[in-house]
Amino acid sequence: MAGIIKKQILKHLSRFTKNLSPDKINLSTLKGEGQLTNLELDEEVLQNVLELPTWLAITRVYCNRASIRIQWTKLKTHPICLCLDKVEVEMKTCEDPRPPNGQSPIALASGQSEYGFAEKVVEGMFIIVNSITIKIHSKAFHASFELWQLQGYSVNPNWQQSDLRLTRITDPCRGEVLTFKEITWQTLRIEADATDNGDQDPVTTPLRLITNQGRIQIALKRRTKDCNVISSKLMFLLDDLLWVLTDSQLKAMMKYAESLSEAMEKSAHQRKSLAPEPVQITPPAPSAQQSWAQAFGGSQGNSNSSSSRLSQYFEKFDVKESSYHLLISRLDLHICDDSQSREPGVSANRLMGGAMQLTFRKMAFDYYPFHWAGDSCKHWVRHCEAMETRGQWAQKLVMEFQSKMEKWHEETGLKPPWHLGVDSLFRRKADSLSSPRKNPLERSPSQGRQPAFQPPAWNRLRSSCMVVRVDDLDIHQVSTAGQPSKKPSTLLSCSRKLHNLPTQVSAIHIEFTEYYFPDNQELPVPCPNLYIQLNGLTFTMDPVSLLWGNLFCLDLYRSLEQFKAIYKLEDSSQKDEHLDIRLDAFWLKVSFPLEKRERAELHRPQALVFSASGMIATNTRHAPHCSCSDLQSLFRGFAAAEFFHSNYDHFPKVPGGFSLLHMLFLHHAFQMDSCLPQPNTLPPQRPKASWDLWSVHFTQISLDFEGTENFKGHTLNFVAPFPLSIWACLPLRWQQAQARKLLLASEGRLKPSASFGSPVQSEALAPDSMSHPRSKTEHDLKSLSGLTEVMEILKEGSSGMDNKGPLTELEDVADVHMLVHSPAHVRVRLDHYQYLALLRLKEVLQRLQEQLTKDTESMTGSPLQNQTACIGVLFPSAEVALLMHPAPGAVDADSAGSDSTSLVDSELSPSEDRELKSDASSDQGPASPEKVLEESSIENQDVSQERPHSNGELQDSGPLAQQLAGKGHEAVESLQAKKLSRTQASSSPAALKPPAGRETAVNGQGELIPLKNIEGELSSAIHMTKDATKEALHATMDLTKEAVSLTKDAFSLGRDRMTSTMHKMLSLPPAKEPMAKTDEGVAAPVSGGAARLRFFSMKRTVSQQSFDGVSLDSSGPEDRISVDSDGSDSFVMLLESESGPESVPPGSLSNVSDNAGVQGSPLVNNYGQGSPAANSSVSPSGEDLIFHPVSVLVLKVNEVSFGIEVRGEDLTVALQAEELTLQQLGTVGLWQFLHGQCPGTCFQESSTLKTGHIRPAVGLRFEVGPGAAVHSPLASQNGFLHLLLHGCDLELLTSVLSGLGPFLEDEEIPVVVPMQIELLNSSITLKDDIPPIYPTSPGPIPITLAMEHVVLKRSDDGVFHIGAAAQDKPSAEVLKSEKRQPPKEQVFLVPTGEVFEQQVKELPILQKELIETKQALANANQDKEKLLQEIRKYNPFFEL
């Protein structure tokens, strides 16, 4: 019996082994046990069984002992157990692929029999291997794989061990069976080392990787009639991995991979040509399979419902196509720099011993080698929305390629020898869908054409797809040995929790697809495509990590190049192969940490963050906002702007620049073939990478400052969110590629086409005819409306090219041409400390760039090749808001004025009451000063008693008309912005400066003052100084009588005119409006005067109510007004005055809420309309932002054209804008301005556009680099700035003008930037809004400075020179203008000696005036000190 069984074993095992004899078999029949020793297996048979790739061959397989145990009575439910003690496998790599694998001996042994009992028993076998050692030998390295305690067993579809009958699913309708297996092991050790060839690269480091528990899950689908495998699914699952890689090990890994790449590529071509036939028989689409199953199941549904349920169960776990998967639950990779022996100088700037940690969570690699190109991917592992997006995009690309092929067949009229007569799968799908959004160009070729000219069998087109997914990742910044032990910050991470990313969404999703025909590798196929999706990634710009990473990668690259040279490997990177790429990104952030400094640390932001809510980048025309129609409209917009024309040489552009609008943009916009024409018998060529046109579209991008401690970490907006589109191409590379093709082509047979010729011709080719073809082309681009005009333009261009030749060196084409456009209004907001942070960031980026260049040059051993770029930026409008510190005159001058007893202080405006209620009384200017003393004392007592019970209601008193007396129309206009800018200070106690306490706020000077101490001390101080205030008013009234009488008479002259103008602007009825009273807010319109004042109240504390404002009564009831004090937060006053051509647009302040979050009344904007009030439910952490006053200056421009040119180290920036307007909002709250609650913050098109502009209003040109030395020697290093203002009529308040200097002042000694500023036909009106020093001042009078042509130059020594541009005029006109000058101007033409004598005569007079001025100043200071001493007797804490 034993002998018979041994013969049967020999019969079957002889196909797998060598030299197997009966004496090597020890068999116990009854026990069901057997043992074999010293087995040598057949290598070729194992290759066929394992289906190894053809670049790998088995040379030896040995097993020392094998034992088997069979449970004869339980074969249906329990597996046969096969135990192997030690298995050794030796393999080698093949430079040329070996012959493909033959048919599996298992299928041969079955004799094409059906899947029966014997096959079930053999397939359910349980295998145990104590150790497996696999050695692989290559010409460059040798590697070994060692596995311990390996087990292989059958499992159910849920990958659990169970009864053998549950480990397979058989569907008799399909004639297929599914089986599931799992392989596990305890330890896997991988080691690789370089081959010792003596004279070759001696520096090698062994590469080691040890993993703990892992498993492989295998699902097989066979045909039951012959046991052949139709498809398989293999999943390689690894648990947590920790891998430390040094740079030398990483070099070794790259070398090994590179040595195998060539052989693997050849093997891949061989595999594609021999795609498995069983897969071809499988129905291509899941829908077809489902319908097939439903057809079989439907016919038997009534008779056998269990068969239908079995089919559904089979469908649930069906393996629709072969695939391979690798899943790593967590990978901690530590990359270390262990290179200590390097050439001197290379590692001088390198962090020695640096290390970087990379952590990847749920990292997956999926490979689908035989996917039908038109098939759905819903059955793929972890199918997600990203796969659907890529599938739709890839389908459009394949349909575009198919349309080109069909068009070529129609044009040639030839039936190809490889035609299979099968219509396109894509075409059938598209026609069945009949999408109305489909491009007509994609539909038309298939309609009405003859069946004789059909493309190849598109339904046989295959694709091999690789999917890479990373659910979460953290890449940390580089750490060094001397660094503190704390964990370094992240360099790149995913913010899953912040953006609430669903579990099926990966942080990184990558799909790479290649196409092939298994029947014929020579058939043209679509270009491979790459799809990438990024979600929630945050990158932190760390210069140290970037420098370390740059040197690390350069070292790897240099080592790899040396390795290629040693082994004479091909460099595949030099091929100009096109790859269709699309990148989708959502919620991206790039953080730029800002330098920390101790000075003003609380005000400095910690980081500048670039955010993008959505981004699409692609080099195809099949993506949202990246289509041909989008490019056409963009190109028309740029062509309509004369600034971007190549023949435009007006300032700020100069002749000789790059031609931005290259014709390559036009080729892509209208889908014109730019490749050289091919003979008709050859199919169209694939596009080259040099012809790529990249488009990047941002849905919303913004820049924000984060981490400002003074604002409790609030994010402050720098650039408001706006959409942005970028289009870029490589015209120089494209033209060089076309020129190489022409050199290779026959000149007689190959004539340049119009599509190739027109981009090549340029001004540089034909300088004598610079205005002919190209300029004419760009002129006609303004009216582009379709393909017909474009073809005419190209014909014109080609005619000029034919005469010059295509190989002439082009000088007006850069390496990169880029168009940047946004249809939205761009807003920029900046304060002083943010400005300083940007300056420091610029220095950091400059140092980083310089260091990267030095490191790269030192590692490569050669200087970097000069790169050129041409960038055009086009915005419809933009604004820059400068958030300056309130001017001292706008905050503190009132107190100074009131202390100096001047009632003319602030033109006696009711909104100028700034100090305590005593000072508020002194600030008013009624007709009768004596009467005001009597009334103020009465009103002061009445109000102090009634206010605590009135809940903040206003007392309507005070003569508005007489308070504004004495200045006339121009004076009132010049005050409007000042009155507005001072209201914020009056609405909070920020102007007072008591000692510091626990709770602080920001006052007008940016200093910290306590809030609680303010309330307590002011409430007591008010009661103490109530009587003292009356005495101080009596003492100062004599000094103000004359000023009051003067202002009264002057005001009466202009009152009627101002009143009527105000009524027209505000649409006010002439009658007095009643005062509206509410619990939450009070609006008190005042009529009958030249201005309109509005009050807004809020709920108050008891301490705030104790120092309310003083109501001043006067003779006329219609002129009564209530004035609030400086210490009260109850009311915000808004003065709405005449809006004339010279007035400054006034702003308004929203109501200020208390900590309880009380909703305020609707805000009234500067148009007299109600607008939503500020959100008053502000947390205490945002309190500083609410009360923080800033002086806002907004610069607005229209039609912004921006050009950047880079030529190696030379950088040129040119900017042009059509109109410049200034908007001065005065002093407003920072929080309400950032939230757009100030009138005037919304952009509006100017209603006074100047249509007669010959030149743009603003022109700016900045040059830096060696080429800028033509302007001055210092310009090559620091740059040269040239600014031109033409036809600008600007108005500036003196407070804003004085604030610009400190705003732009750097904290470090700035470098001298040579510059030239030209003012052409412009005027500047200065309006003084700072209170006068003396009470006798008649008030500020606006000063207008008109300039016909003034030039301000700054030389290298920092000296400014002011002069006129006399060179622009003929010499005769200059002489005539000098003769027409008045005699007083001719003092500059007097000889030097006479000038000296005249100065000597005037010297005594000047000295006398100087002495008198000093004496007057000393007297004024004494008077001021006396008054201060008198006031401090009653209020010790009073300060100016």
From Swiss-Prot:
Region span, Disordered: 267-307, 430-456, 751-780, 891-1008, 1106-1180
Compositionally biased residues, Basic and acidic residues: 911-920
Gene Ontology CC annotation, any one: late endosome
Compositional bias segments (type: Low complexity): 287-307, 985-995, 1134-1150
Ranges where the Chorein N-terminal domain occurs: 3-95
Keywords assigned by UniProt, alphabetized: Coiled coil, Endosome, Phosphoprotein
GO molecular function, one term: identical protein binding
Positions where Phosphoserine occurs in the chain: S444, S446, S755, S758, S988, S1103, S1106
Record Pfam families: BLTP3A_B (PF24917)
Transmembrane spans: none
Coiled-coil regions, chain positions: 837-860, 1401-1435
Composition-biased stretches (Polar residues): 1151-1180
InterPro entries, per the entry: BLTP3A/B
Location(s), subcellular: Late endosome
Assembly: Homodimer (Potential). Interacts with UHRF1.
Job description of the protein: Tube-forming lipid transport protein which probably mediates the transfer of lipids between membranes at organelle contact sites. May be involved in the retrograde traffic of vesicle clusters in the endocytic pathway to the Golgi complex.
UniProt protein name: Bridge-like lipid transfer protein family member 3A
Origin species: Homo sapiens (Human)
